[in-house]
């Protein structure tokens, strides 16, 4: 597989074309950002950890019947993925109250949500990824009602699979965001799943083991990511 020119540079990943029109290469960088890219720092080993963490999770999801863009690891910081036509919407599943939900509703952090909640946000850094609903997605042409239904179904399936995986590792899956795209007419899970895009707390101590350590200045960010990977059995 030949790596060609950079197609897109995000806050923490770069996307490259290949000699296959249906495949891309994702490069996981050490860049770590918060507050919609207003704060960016370099954290050693982060690209490697997130690349291998993502590969592990995507393979677990594929085994459970969730279609993903992931094909294979290419190295410590790179993987080969399917080229998706991305839907510009973030799907957020919450099992415990945290983050923007706490700020928006004024509820206490850590409350268990039963049932888990499903939310939609428009991917738009300039607007701060605004909270939207299903009617907005269809009315503005960001996706169809059928695509939304499949995205919700797959998001809840991911939650079911990963809740057990993390629980067995002594971790609470507090919340997470997913992005989806279309590949040959099928809705497929895209982007990545890593501690950058989810909240994970130690089940006993409620210690934060995710990017909130960076956002809140708690320190030991990569050490926490590596601890989560170790508990799951991710080969680093």
UniProtKB/Swiss-Prot annotation:
<protein>
    <recommendedName>
        <fullName>Phosphoribosylaminoimidazole-succinocarboxamide synthase</fullName>
        <ecNumber>6.3.2.6</ecNumber>
    </recommendedName>
</protein>
<keyword id="KW-0547">Nucleotide-binding</keyword>
<dbReference type="InterPro" id="IPR050089">
    <property type="entry name" value="SAICAR_synthetase"/>
</dbReference>
<dbReference type="GO" id="GO:0006189">
    <property type="term" value="P:'de novo' IMP biosynthetic process"/>
</dbReference>
<dbReference type="GO" id="GO:0005524">
    <property type="term" value="F:ATP binding"/>
</dbReference>
<dbReference type="InterPro" id="IPR001636">
    <property type="entry name" value="SAICAR_synth"/>
</dbReference>
<dbReference type="InterPro" id="IPR028923">
    <property type="entry name" value="SAICAR_synt/ADE2_N"/>
</dbReference>
<keyword id="KW-0436">Ligase</keyword>
<comment type="pathway">
    <text>Purine metabolism; IMP biosynthesis via de novo pathway; 5-amino-1-(5-phospho-D-ribosyl)imidazole-4-carboxamide from 5-amino-1-(5-phospho-D-ribosyl)imidazole-4-carboxylate: step 1/2.</text>
</comment>
<dbReference type="Pfam" id="PF01259">
    <property type="entry name" value="SAICAR_synt"/>
</dbReference>
<dbReference type="InterPro" id="IPR018236">
    <property type="entry name" value="SAICAR_synthetase_CS"/>
</dbReference>
<comment type="similarity">
    <text>Belongs to the SAICAR synthetase family.</text>
</comment>
<dbReference type="GO" id="GO:0004639">
    <property type="term" value="F:phosphoribosylaminoimidazolesuccinocarboxamide synthase activity"/>
</dbReference>
<dbReference type="InterPro" id="IPR033934">
    <property type="entry name" value="SAICAR_synt_PurC"/>
</dbReference>
<keyword id="KW-0067">ATP-binding</keyword>
<dbReference type="GO" id="GO:0005829">
    <property type="term" value="C:cytosol"/>
</dbReference>
<keyword id="KW-0658">Purine biosynthesis</keyword>
<dbReference type="GO" id="GO:0009236">
    <property type="term" value="P:cobalamin biosynthetic process"/>
</dbReference>
């Amino acid at each position: 597989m030949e790596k060609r020119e950079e197609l897109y540079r995000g806050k923490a990943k770069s996307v490259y074309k290949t000699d296959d029109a249906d495949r891309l290469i994702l490069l996981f960088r050490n860049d770590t950002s918060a507050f919609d890219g207003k704060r960016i720092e370099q954290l050693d080993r982060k690209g490697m950890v997130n690349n291998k963490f993502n590969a592990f999770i995507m393979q677990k999801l594929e085994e459970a019947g969730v279609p993903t863009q992931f094909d294979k690891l290419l190295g410590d910081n790179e993987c080969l993925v399917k080229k998706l036509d991305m839907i510009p919407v973030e799907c957020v599943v919450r099992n415990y109250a945290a983050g923007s939900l706490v700020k928006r509703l004024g509820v206490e952090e850590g409350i268990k949500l039963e049932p888990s909640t499903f939310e939609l946000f428009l991917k738009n850094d300039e607007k701060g990824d605004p909270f939207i609903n299903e009617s907005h997605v269809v009315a503005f042409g960001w996706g169809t009602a059928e695509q939304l239904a499949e995205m919700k179904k797959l998001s809840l399936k991911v939650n079911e699979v990963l809740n057990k995986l993390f629980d067995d590792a002594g971790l609470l899956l507090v919340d997470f965001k997913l992005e989806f795209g279309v590949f040959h007419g099928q809705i497929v899970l895209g982007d990545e799943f890593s501690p950058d895009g989810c909240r994970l707390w130690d089940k006993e101590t409620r210690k934060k083991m995710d990017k909130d350590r960076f956002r809140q200045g708690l320190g030991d960010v990569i050490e926490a990511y590596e601890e989560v990977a170790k508990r799951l059995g991710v080969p680093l």
